[in-house]
């Protein structure tokens, strides 16, 4: 009966998930901060093991609005990061994610829709749909993570948080006209149009 209602049980985690929303960003003109936020999770290698880093990114400014570093890949970390971003910055028009189990979990979907926000999801395996976050992951890893060998989760969490603060406030981006994400967040920049 769950399949008939658009609900499936995720076989990997046992988390009840939602019917997948469609991708809403195709040909969307993104011309202001707080219009579209993207969430994604990546793994960060440590000296022994790894942690998961989930971030909320404003697509217009590339600013990382909130993040969570955790030892498990659960919906609660995405929910908490999104709740922190909404509390600090208001709500966007659209939240875009991939189809990871933490984002298809009913808990996360309810959080997004409960704020009156539209939920958009990339096509399965379509990394280009979330290219802004993928670029940020590359930057975080090459400029910080790969230069470290984190001993503890606490050390990773603290160091990544320091880097994200620097990334937002001091690191200029060529794609942002040499401005930092913070400068664009505050002052705006020319309109971005996503490719078809």
Report residues per predicted region.
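Single conserved hydrophobic/aromatic residue that forms the stacking wall/gate
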Residues: 1-18
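An active-site-proximal beta-strand-loop segment
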Residues: 30-65, 71-73
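Acidic active-site catalytic centers that drive phospho-/nucleotidyl reactions
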Residues: 40, 58, 82, 98, ...
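Active-site beta-loop-alpha junctions of metal-dependent nucleic acid enzymes
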Residues: 49, 67-89, 94, 101-104
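Short small-residue beta-strand/loop micro-motif enriched in glycine and branched aliphatics
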Residues: 61-67, 119-122, 146-147
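Buried hydrophobic side chains on well-structured beta-strands
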Residues: 62, 95-98
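C-terminal domain-tail junction helix/linker
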Residues: 113-115, 139-196
């Amino acid at each position: 009966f769950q399949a008939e209602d658009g609900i499936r049980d995720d076989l990997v985690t046992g988390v009840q998930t939602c019917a997948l929303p469609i991708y809403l960003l195709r040909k969307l003109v993104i011309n202001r901060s707080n219009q579209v936020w993207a969430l994604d999770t990546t793994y960060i290698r440590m000296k022994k093991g790894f942690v998961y880093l989930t971030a909320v990114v404003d697509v217009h400014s590339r600013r990382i609005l909130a993040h969570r570093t955790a030892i498990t890949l659960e919906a609660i970390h995405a929910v908490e990061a999104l709740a922190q971003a909404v509390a600090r910055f208001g709500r966007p028009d659209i939240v875009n994610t991939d189809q990871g189990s933490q984002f298809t979990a009913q808990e996360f979907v309810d959080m997004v829709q409960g704020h009156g926000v539209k939920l958009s999801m990339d096509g399965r395996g379509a990394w280009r749909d979330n290219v802004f976050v993928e670029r940020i992951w590359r930057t975080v890893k090459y400029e910080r993570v790969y230069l470290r060998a984190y001993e503890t989760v606490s050390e990773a969490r603290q160091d990544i948080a320091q880097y994200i603060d620097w990334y937002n406030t001091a690191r200029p981006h060529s794609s942002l006209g040499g401005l930092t994400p913070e400068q664009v967040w505050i002052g705006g920049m020319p309109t971005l149009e996503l490719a078809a």
